């Protein structure tokens, strides 16, 4: 396994650990999700270029489209939550609270 793959895998793992550890704020969760998507995009692109998969060359672009849609929805959710509750705590989003 080359150093590039190890670094990209470590970036994905660090983003996943950040998502698990700093999940109290919605903004930090969204940033960790974006880091995961970016490292996944780079990993897929490097793997496709190294293995010369010509048929799968469109897959990273599709992943970027889904990442952009996820970022737009996350940003709109963040604006809605911060306007409604005044903060971006994920604990305020509990539907079972009375």
Curated annotation (Swiss-Prot):
Localization in the cell: Mitochondrion inner membrane
Enzyme Commission number(s) from the entry: 7.1.1.2
Catalytic activity: a ubiquinone + NADH + 5 H(+)(in) = a ubiquinol + NAD(+) + 4 H(+)(out)
Residue stretches spanning the membrane: 1-21, 29-49, 61-81
Main location: mitochondrion
Transport among keywords: yes
Gene Ontology terms for molecular function: NADH dehydrogenase (ubiquinone) activity
Disulfide bonds, paired cysteine numbers: none
Enzyme class label: translocase
Coiled coil: none
Pfam families for this protein: Oxidored_q2 (PF00420)
Subunit structure: Core subunit of respiratory chain NADH dehydrogenase (Complex I) which is composed of 45 different subunits.
Family: Belongs to the complex I subunit 4L family.
Name of protein: NADH-ubiquinone oxidoreductase chain 4L
Organism from which the protein derives: Neofelis nebulosa
Lineage: Eukaryota, Metazoa, Chordata, Craniata, Vertebrata
């Amino acid at each position: 396994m080359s150093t590039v793959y190890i670094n990209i895998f470590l970036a994905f793992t660090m983003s996943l650990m950040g998502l698990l550890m700093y999940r109290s704020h919605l903004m930090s969760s969204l940033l960790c999700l974006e880091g995961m998507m970016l490292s996944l995009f780079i990993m897929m692109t490097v793997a496709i270029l190294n293995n010369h998969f010509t048929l799968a060359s469109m897959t990273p672009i599709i992943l970027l489209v889904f990442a952009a849609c996820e970022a737009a929805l996350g940003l709109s959710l963040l604006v809605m939550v911060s306007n409604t509750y005044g903060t971006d705590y994920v604990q305020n989003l509990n539907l079972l609270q009375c």
